Every structure is written in C-alpha cells, then in structure tokens.
Amino acid sequence: MTASTQNGSPTPPPAAPTATNQESKNMTANPADASESQSPANEKGSGTAESGQKHTSTAANAKDPLRPRRKKAKRACFACQRAHLTCGDERPCQRCIKRGLQDACHDGVRKKAKYLHDAPNEALMPGIRRNFYNQANATRTNANQQQNGPNSNSNKDSRQNVAANFYSPQSASNFDVYTQAKSQQGQGHIPPTVMQDTSINPSAFQAPSPTSTPNFDLSSNPPNRNLSSAMTQTPSSASNQTQDPFGAAFFDPSHPALFNFDIASMNFGNRYGALEFGMLGHMATGAGDTPPSDSATQRGSIGRSSGTFTAQNFGDSTNTQSPFLFGDPVLNDWNPSGQSQTNPRNNNIYNQNTVAGQMGEQHPNAFAIESAPMNFASPGSTESPQMTTMNQFDEANAKFSSRTALMHQTNPHQPPPISTPGLKHQGFQVGVKRRYRSPSSIYESVKEPYSYTSGFHNLTAFIQRRFSPQKTLQIAKALASIRPSFIATTKTLNQDDLIFMEKCFQRTLWEYEDFINACGTPTIVCRRTGEIAAVGKEFSILTGWKKEVLLGKEPNLNVNTGGSSPRGSGTFTPRNGNGVDPHSGMSAAGGGGGRTQPVFLAELLDDDSVIEFYEDFAKLAFGDSRGSVMTTCKLLKYKTKEDSAALFQGKEAQQGGSDGKGGGGGGDVAATAATTSTSTSNGANSSGHANANRNNTNPKNSSPPSSSSAAAAGPLHGAQLSPKQTWGKRGIAGEAGMNQLGFRDGKVECSYCWTVKRDVFDIPMLIVMNFLPCI
C-alpha cells in the first residue's frame, strides 16, 4: 500500500506503477535481491518517486558483472531454507535482520539419510576449527530436558552452552591423547575424566578387540581390586587435567596415531560420512594401533579375550609370556589364574580398568569383536541399556566371589589347576595349525612337465580292458568331442609353458589340501586324465581305498569292477578272472608285483556312472568355467582277491551248515578263516578283528553276532557271519557305520557334486569331487 493511498488520494502517483513493473521484471533475474528490496518497501510503506528510482538503480546494479557475488552458506537458516533464498554464515543472517526475525534465526534441519536416522541433529552440524559434536554435553542436555522440560531456563542455558562449545574456538581440546596415554602407560595412571562419568564415557567398560589395542596400560593395578576403588581413585599427577581426552573434541583429525586420516581434508557435508569413509579405509588397509609384531591381529583374526593375555604378549618375549597367544582357546582356559596375580604386569589388557582383572579371570570368556572407545561409536548406541553404575559390578562380583568361596569350601580336595608347562610333561601334543611346507618349494621342485599323453594312453587301455565294446564306444565318443579343443589349446605351448602348467597345478593342489583336511565331506581331486591327485580320509573310510593306493604309492590289488556279473548277484568276480592288475596286466596275487601309479577315477565308479561322468565332462570341460554337475553315482569298494575268496568260502560253509548236521561249527571255522584273511589283506583295525576272531573260534557260540559287533568287525565279516542280517539306515554312525555301507554288492550309492578348474591357458587342470552317501 502506497503513501498516496493512505492519504486518501483517488489516484496513485505515476512513478509507483513504473517502479512496480520494473521490480516485477527484475525478480526473475535475481529473486533474492528483489525480495530483499521489496520487503522494506512493503513494511515501511514508502511509495515516493525517490523510492521507485532507488529500486530501478538496484535492479540495474544487479546485472553488473563486477558486482561481488554472495557466497553460499554452509547451512541456511530455517527462514531462508523455507523461502529457498541465499543465506549467510552469520547468525542472525542479514535477511532475518531486515525482516525483524533475528531472534528466531537458527540453522535449518536437513533431511537425514537413511544411515543417519539414529544420529542427533547436533552431530550433523559441520565442525568449525576442529570443534565437533560433544556426546557428553549432548547427553547431559537430554537429561536436563527430561527432568525440567523443554522450555525451562536451564535447558535454554544448556543449549547455549552446547552451541558455544560447538562453535567457539576456545573450546577446542588441546589434550594430546596419544602422547598423554603413552606417558601414563608406564606409570599406570588413568586420566581423571575417563573415570568420572561412566554413563557418559562407557569406554571403560569396553574390551578392545585384536583389531585395535587400548590406549592405556593398567598393568600396574592389582587384579583383585574392587571396581569402586579403581574408579574413585585418581592419580594426583593428573588432577590438574580438566579436559576429557575423548569428550571435548570428538577426536583429533590431525593426529596420525588414531585413524590415520584427516576429516578436514574430506569434502563431506557432515562428519558421519567422513567417518564412515575413513573407517572403511582404515579397516581395509589394516593401519591401526595394532603393533606390527602382532601378525595375527593384522590379518583381522578374532582373538578370544581371556585372562592369560598380557601386555607383554605384544612384542615382549619374556618367560612369563603366555605360550598360547592366539592358539587354541581351550588351551587358554587351562592357564592358571594365579599366574596373573603373582606378576603385576600379567594383567588382562582386554579388560582394562573395568574390574581390574576380575571379569577376565572369573567370569566366562567372551569374544571381542571391536572395542574402540564408545565416543567413536554412533551416539544412539550409547543410549542403549548397559551397566552404567559401579553398584551393579560390585553386586555381581560379590555374588560370584561368594559362590566361588562356597565351591572351594564344599570341595576341599579340588585338584590343582593345570598349567601349560604341565601339559608338555603329560605328553599333550598341540595340533599343528599351519604346514611347514612353503609354496616356494613347489616352484623349486617342479623341473619337468607332467606327461598327460601317457596318462590318456593308460586310461584308454584300462577302459578297453574293463568295459564292453558298446560302453567303450560311448566313452570314446565323449572324449573325442573335446579332443579338438585340447589340440587347439596345447599346440602353441612349449616346454616352459608345460612346466609352468604343472607348477600351477601343484600350487592349486597345495591350497586344496587344507580344504580337504578341514572339510568333513568325502573329497577327491584328480587330474583331467582322471588320475587321483588328492584324497580325504573320509573318502577312504567310505570306500575302503587307502590313500597310498589311490595316489599310486602302493600297488593296486582291487578286483572289484562291479559290472562283470548280472546285477544283484552280490559277487565280486572281476572281468579278468585270473586276478590281473588292470594297471600293469601282471598277476595281482603276487602281493605288490604290479607297477604303481595313481588310480583312475573310472576305477572308483561302476559302469553306468563312468559313462555318465565322461558325458558330463565333455560338456563342462570347455563350457561354463564356473559350472558344476550334481548327480548320483555308485562307488566301488576296495576288494582284493583274498576278500572275494573268503566271502565265497564263508557263504558256502554257511549254506552247507544249514543243510547238514553240525554245520554250524564248520561255518564258524570257515568264517573265522575268512575273517583272518580279510584283516590281513586290508590292514584294518587289528583290535576289532581280534575280538571278532575270539568270538568266532568258540564252538559253543553258534548264534549270530549282534549288530554292534558286526559293525566293529567290518562289513565283510558281518556279511559272512549273518548273511540275512539287515542294516538299518538309522543305525549308521561313526567309522564302523561308514564301513558297512555297500557290504552286500560292493557298491556305495552316493550323491556327488564336481566341478572343473582351469589353468591360466584355459585348459581343464583338475576336477574336484565331493561325495555324500545316500543313507
């Protein structure tokens, strides 16, 4: 409303509409300047011609390229944020002063990201001169608001104090966390403010993990000191320190000893994003406070927090050092608790000043995952229910101490604790965690390439001896389909490439050895020719094939081919009835006269399974490099000629004994002879066979043995002594139950999954197979 309108004049001055039109045109070019110039005119009611000329000159100056540009503020005020106008860094801003809103000018609240939903608004404010959000002050402010209400005078003062601590440069903490902790480390001193407020600084109740070592060494504190005394006593040398080492400044971003990154150099709108980015890099690089001597923690392993971990374990090798630092956690529990009491330095560094060693020695052990001070955690996490008073610790410790004392009184003859040196005298052998063999030995030992040509020739000869012409033709077609691919990939390889190929195979096999030993699944690894290169003990238990026989270190005397006689006859008659070794063609009765070489995969499967395997191998060898095949098969049990003869003698004797008189004793004697020959040829457990022989040689004992004795004696013996006995699938357990699988027809029905791993030349290098019996 113009001045002429207020005075009652019927027509406005001619300059007023001109200025209004000019102002409306300039608002599109610079809405901020137009609104700022228009607001005083509307409030004061100035409508003179001089006012219109002033607006015209201001609009003209807005287009001046030499006019200084206004910088954008880091955070706009609430009024400017709602009006989408440019604000300033000062509070109150100039626009709010012009509009008379200087009392209500405060920073606007931005929309939080999803990962910041639990962060308070103060934490998202940008820091000025290394002054970041103070969790201690914020917690006290929230407590005051809950007690006095949001509009009380005390809360207004607290909010002003928080803002002053946040923005004032004088509130920056000059406390050097790293050097102060290092200087107090040898003296056993604790910064006073760490112990003053346990609810604000719960870092005292945090157990550090192997990924970050503590900043304070409390090894000089006695381990049996109560929590109350440990928290109330503060050293006199640190009484003049009033700053909180972790509270006033969130952390010192310029100090390389904490996180090795500078938050000020990162272009983030808030410190949460910078902290997340910096901590990810800190965790990925492994560059923390962990000493270089602790190689186990640098690998990111999770150690177990127990009372035997001492401060001297990290780099100090004295006689009082725990011998099992990151070994078996069971061995850590066997260390005597008195050892840490006699040595003042042998305190639990993972318990720090919480209970002075009591929690680590008396209470159950726990796994420490991460234990940076709680000030570095999300502010929302400190508000969760936790033990914030020392009365809870005192009560728990008192109950546990009384219970422990009662146990000692009721059991005066309690054996002494087992010490680690005592374990050595008792002959306790600690398992080797890592092999002594180095991968470098593989590159030094391999001098010649592996002859795959002779391996394929031996495979072809074995297939022709064992399978019928029709089945041999099916296998030959499958191998012929991938023969051109083998020729194309190997024709450009020279001698050095072939040697390198064998080194790659041995190096990969070296990695699979740990996998096979750690995995409880029957597993074998073979070359592309089908020759067995590695085998697990579970596979030997399942099939009866010894590892030395499969790897070619002992002669292969197996005569069980599983397909020469009609299906279901239950016989072990081989195709070569004279017991010829399928590898060398020599007689197997000679007891090891044949040539030793690795067993082919085709010798472990029945006829149908072998044909199916090579058909799938032809599709997967040069097909999907990450593909796998999952199907069923039948594994052949390891049976020698003596085993087959003993089985036939036992069955004939039992059949004759059932027809004539007194046949029971003859059957028992024949079964005893069969048992003796079988145990000699297989080299099985001598104690179990001896027990079976003693039971069978008694003429009075003509009744069939129980299922447990038959399982202990082996599957072959159970078949001889009780041919009509059936094994329940639920009764299979342990090694004895695995041995009795396939005792009838010499075949173990399994489900197996296998895949092909290629080398650097994209040639099939090895085949990894996992078996599970169908029970």
Curated annotation (Swiss-Prot):
Annotated compartments: Nucleus
UniProt biased composition (Low complexity): 218-229, 669-713
One GO MF term: RNA polymerase II transcription regulatory region sequence-specific DNA binding
Biased composition (Gly residues): 657-668
Key words, A-Z: Activator, DNA-binding, Gluconeogenesis, Metal-binding, Nucleus, Transcription, Transcription regulation, Zinc
Keyword Zinc: yes
GO biological process terms, semicolon-separated: cellular response to starvation; gluconeogenesis
Positions of the DNA-binding region: 77-105
Region annotation Disordered: where it falls in the sequence: 1-70, 179-248, 286-351, 556-592, 649-725
Cellular component terms per the entry's GO annotation: nucleus
UniProt keyword Zinc, yes or no: yes
Extent of Polar residues compositional bias: 21-41, 48-60, 195-217, 230-244, 292-323, 334-351, 557-576
Superkingdom of the source species: Eukaryota
Entries under PANTHER family matching the protein: TRANSCRIPTION ACTIVATOR OF GLUCONEOGENESIS ERT1, ZN(II)2CYS6 TRANSCRIPTION FACTOR (EUROFUNG)-RELATED
Family stated for the protein in its record: Belongs to the ERT1/acuK family.
Record function comment: Transcription factor which regulates nonfermentable carbon utilization. Activator of gluconeogenetic genes.
Protein name: Transcription activator of gluconeogenesis HCBG_00867
Species of origin: Ajellomyces capsulatus (strain G186AR / H82 / ATCC MYA-2454 / RMSCC 2432) (Darling's disease fungus)
